[in-house]
Amino acid sequence: MHREGIGGWKKRIPSVSKRKTKCLTHRQMTSSFFLVFA
C-alpha cells in the first residue's frame, strides 16, 4: 500500500510540473503578443 502511494505521487508530480510549464509558456506567448501589438 505504501509503495503504491509513492508511485501515485511520482505519477502526479510530472503532470503538475507539465501544467506549470504550460502556464509559463502561455504567459510568455501572451506577453510577446502584447509587445508585438503595443
From Swiss-Prot:
This is Uncharacterized protein YDR118W-A.
